[in-house]
Amino acid sequence: MATPLVDPAK
């Protein structure tokens, strides 16, 4: 699966 890791520190 190609799940983009979105960091919550953005």
Swiss-Prot record:
State the name under which the record lists this protein.
30 kDa non-secretory protein 1
Q: Which domain of life is it from?
A: Bacteria
